[in-house]
């Protein structure tokens, strides 16, 4: 949104003021600058337009199986609120995506997060692999490491990362070989 673009530019200007030259001659952010950078990253992760774009891009897959949606561990700003008015009542991105896919698009979806027990996640993985009762998993960071679900064919990544390990892990979830899977698709927002 325009408000998000303005806030992004403002955070960027503030970060520029927080650059300092290190002993090695390279520039780095001060602690204050790092906090501003985190705010800017959260703003990008929770951008409202990502939800609109997801709805548009996922429509051709509405009846498919083995879909994965990675969400940011962030809240999405209500377009009618000011950026300074964010509070605990704002919805988490994962909840908005779950509502969009499950209620609006009538898809069979489930969240796959640290809130689900180990046993619940095992059941979700089995159901997802079968594809009969579960079309899509909606996750935050729970699938970053140590989870093997090779049947994932299509991923929608709303939470990109600059961490190389996380970047590779998230794509690796989709790019694994699986019986009957000839290719994989990744949409990175």
PLM region descriptions:
Residues 7, 151, 166-170:
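Alpha-helical scaffold elements adjacent to nucleotide-binding pockets in ATP/GTP-utilizing enzyme cores
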Residues 1-65, 74-92, 98-99:
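Interdomain helical connector at the RecA1-RecA2 junction of SF1/SF2 helicase-like NTPases
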Residues 120-122, 164-171:
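Short, charged, surface-exposed secondary-structure boundary motifs
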Residues 4, 74-76, 117, 143-144, ...:
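Conserved nucleotide-binding/hydrolysis micro-motifs of P-loop NTPases
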Residues 173-189:
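Conserved segment of the helicase C-terminal RecA-like domain
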């Amino acid at each position: 949104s325009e408000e998000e673009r303005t806030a992004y530019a403002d955070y960027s200007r503030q970060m520029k003021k927080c650059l300092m030259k290190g002993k090695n001659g390279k520039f780095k952010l001060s602690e204050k600058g790092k906090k501003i950078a985190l705010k800017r990253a959260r703003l990008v992760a929770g951008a409202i337009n990502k939800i609109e774009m997801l709805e548009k891009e996922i429509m051709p897959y509405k009846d498919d199986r083995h879909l994965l949606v990675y969400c940011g561990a962030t809240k999405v700003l209500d377009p009618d609120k000011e950026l300074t008015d964010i509070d605990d009542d704002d919805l988490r991105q994962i909840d908005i995506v779950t509502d969009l896919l499950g209620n609006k698009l009538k898809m069979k979806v489930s969240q796959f997060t640290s809130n689900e027990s180990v046993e619940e996640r095992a059941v979700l993985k089995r159901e997802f692999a079968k594809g009969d009762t579960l079309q899509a998993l909606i996750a935050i960071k729970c699938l970053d490491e140590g989870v093997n679900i090779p049947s994932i064919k299509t991923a929608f990544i709303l939470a990109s990362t600059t961490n190389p390990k996380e970047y590779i892990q998230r794509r690796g979830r989709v790019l694994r070989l699986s019986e009957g899977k000839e290719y994989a698709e990744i949409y990175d927002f």
